[in-house]
A protein has these predicted regions:
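Short beta-strand elements that form the blades of beta-propeller/WD-repeat-like
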Residues: 1-2, 30-36, 42, 70-81, ...
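Start-of-domain marker
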Residues: 1-31
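Short loop/turn segments that connect beta-strands within beta-propeller blades
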Residues: 5-8, 46-50, 91-95, 130-134
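Surface loop/turn motifs at the tips and blade-to-blade linkers of beta-strand repeat domains
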Residues: 12-17, 56-62, 99-105, 137-143
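Repeated scaffold domains used in trafficking and secretory/extracellular systems
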Residues: 18-26, 62-71, 105-115, 142-153
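Surface-exposed, polar helix/loop patches in the mature regions of secreted/periplasmic/lumenal proteins
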Residues: 34-93, 100
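Short helix-loop boundary/capping segments
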Residues: 103-106, 111-112, 119-135
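Intrinsically disordered, low-complexity segments enriched in Gly and acidic/Ser/Thr residues
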Residues: 127-167
Length: 167
């Protein structure tokens, strides 16, 4: 269940048919992304929490088994396709893949993005990609467990067991 509170009222979105919400991304408040992993579905909401797009990856001609999702630029989302072990930049309006990475050899721990970059955290590496899907950086991972965005800043923290490292 998603709530949006304003001084005047509270707006709620809930989709019981899709089960448990795996992740929500409100980087762009005009296109809020909700990922329901159990049903392999992404819902795009507008700023009033009205459903504007529904992407059911089970019904696409090129089936995708998505394990992680994050916001992209324009009408795209970043998805990690478990079947191919690839990160993909997916255009949800045209229902096509704009970019694909080479297969990732390790288990994926986290995925986050902004308009310019996407970070894919695996057991052994942290990968950074630009908005075209080209790898910019590959850093060995020995202690990072997830990536968190600072609320008031355009920075990310790499979270370890004992501390947070700013990027």
């Amino acid at each position: 269940m998603i709530h949006k509170k304003t001084p005047e009222n509270t707006i709620t979105y809930n989709n019981l048919q899709l089960g448990t919400l795996q992740s929500a991304n409100a980087f762009n408040p005009l296109k809020i992304n909700l990922f329901y992993k159990d049903f392999n579905t992404v819902i795009i909401l507008d700023n009033r929490l009205a459903e504007i797009f529904k992407i059911d990856f089970n019904t696409l001609s090129s089936y995708k088994d998505v394990s992680h999702m994050s916001t992209g630029h324009d009408n795209t989302i970043w998805v990690f396709n478990q079947n191919l072990q690839k990160l993909e930049l997916f255009d949800y309006k045209s229902r096509t893949t704009r970019a694909q990475t080479v297969p990732v050899q390790n288990a994926v721990l986290d995925l986050t993005s902004n308009y310019n970059s996407c970070w894919l955290l695996t057991e052994n590496y942290l990968y950074q990609y630009n908005y075209f899907g080209s790898m910019v950086k590959k850093i060995e991972n020995k202690v990072i467990s997830n990536i968190e965005k600072n609320d008031n800043e355009d920075q990310y923290e790499l979270v370890t067991e004992n501390e947070a490292i700013r990027t």
